[in-house]
From Swiss-Prot:
Its biological purpose: Intracellular transport of retinol.
Domain of life: Eukaryota
Residues that coordinate or bind all-trans-retinol: K41, Q109
Tissue expression summary: Higher expression in adult small intestine and to a much lesser extent in fetal kidney.
Free-text comment on this protein's domains from its UniProt entry: Forms a beta-barrel structure that accommodates hydrophobic ligands in its interior.
Locations listed in the record: Cytoplasm
Sequence similarity: Belongs to the calycin superfamily. Fatty-acid binding protein (FABP) family.
TM helices/strands, residue ranges: none
Name of the gene encoding the protein in the UniProt record: RBP2
GO BP terms in the entry: epidermis development; fatty acid transport; vitamin A metabolic process
Pfam families, per the entry: Lipocalin (PF00061)
Protein name (record): Retinol-binding protein 2
PANTHER family on file: FATTY ACID BINDING PROTEIN
Length: 134
């Protein structure tokens, strides 16, 4: 594994995204649209500083963060909540804890070969996404 996550990544698979969105109380119509979308993720990484853009034909989401520095995140394009987020390294895995209304919320992201793996968690639901480097 590597800590270098720079690049453009295209979604290959998206397992249990609907379950994850239900745990976030996202409405039925939005879930039905979102679950059918393919996302592209662009990561601009400079050491521990990240600028991430996630795009689809429905909604886009940008988040900038520095590893080890807590920040206020507004999850506008997902569930419209404000959370306190902290991203840290666990080995070569980025781990984000998002504190707010929902318990056990966050994500893990890592690289293996030419694939980026992302696990999104809320409550007891885990969504597993795989992206391939473009």
């Amino acid at each position: 594994m590597t800590r270098d996550q720079n690049g453009t990544w295209e979604m290959e698979s998206n397992e249990n995204f609907e379950g994850y969105m239900k745990a976030l109380d996202i409405d039925f119509a939005t879930r039905k649209i979102a679950v059918r979308l393919t996302q592209t993720k662009v990561i601009d990484q400079d050491g521990d500083n990240f600028k991430t853009k996630t795009t689809s034909t429905f909604r886009n989401y940008d988040v900038d963060f520095t590893v080890g520095v807590e920040f206020d995140e507004y999850t506008k394009s997902l569930d419209n909540r404000h959370v306190k987020a902290l991203v840290t390294w666990e080995g070569d895995v980025l781990v984000c804890v998002q504190k707010g209304e929902k318990e056990n919320r966050g994500w893990k992201q890592w690289i293996e070969g030419d694939k980026l793996y992302l696990e999104l968690t809320c409550g007891d639901q885990v969504c597993r996404q795989v992206f391939k480097k473009k």
